Amino acid sequence: MHLSSSNTPSVFVAWQDLASREWHTVARLSQVEDHFELGFTHGADRVGDIARRLFNSTLEQNYYSDQLTALFRNKIPPRSRSDFRKMANWLNLTGDESDFELLGKFGLIPGTDGLLVYPSPKVENGRYSVEFFVHGIRHTHGEAEAHHLHGDVLKWCSEIEPGDSLCPLLDVQNPADPNAVALRAEHGTILIGYVPRFYAADIRTILSRTALARTARITVLKNNHDAPLQMRLLCRFSASVPDDFRALDDSDHKMKAEEAAFL
C-alpha cells in the first residue's frame, strides 16, 4: 500500500524539545477512505529515537490502521466532557465535526506529551489559508516585563477583537529559526508573538514576494479570554498564491518512506 497523495486530508505531528523549546515536525497522519496512514518525515531525523519512544517503531516504515490510535484519540476530549463545548468554541468549532477534523484542531492545543497535531494549510482557487494559535505570547510578555518593554501586551490582548488584524515581521536574525515570522499589533509597536514554526517557511515565502505580500492578511478569529495564553489568540493567515504553490514544501515535511505496513 502506498502512502496517501497530497490531496488526501492530512495532519502533521510536531514534537517539542523541552531543552530548546523548538518544535520539530516528525510525522504525517492521513485519512484514506476507511483507514489511517502514518509516516515519518525527514524532520524526525533531528530528534533521535522519537519514533521508538512515541510509536514503538522505526523511521523507515509507514503504517496504517482502521482507527485512530490511542496517541491521537487522546488529543480529542470526549464530547461528554463538561467543558467540551467551551474548548470547541476556542477553536472556532461547532463540536459536530468528524474525529479527524477535531484532531486537526484540538491537536493545536499543547499537551503534556510534548506533541502538537496541526493540519496542512488549504490551497484552493489560488488562495492560501491556515489557522493557528499565536505562539510565544507568554515568552514575549516575560521578556518584555524583564526589560520594561511593551509590558502592556497582555492589556492589548484583552482588548483585541475578532476581525482585527495583526502585522507580520520577518525576523531574519532569529537565532533559532531564520524563517521566523513575528506578529505585532496593527497600530503601535507591541510585539504579540510568533507564527508557529511549522507554518513560518510558507508564510515567509509568500511575504517575500511583493505581489503576494500585498494580498496577505492576518486576521484574529477568536480572542479566548478564558483560555490559557497558548490558546488565547486564534488567527487566520490568507494570501493569493500561484496555482503551482505547494504548501509545506520543505524537507522537514517530506516523507521518509513510500510503503506502508500494518500498525
Question: What does each model-identified segment do?
Answer:
Residues 1-263:
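Conserved active-site motif detector
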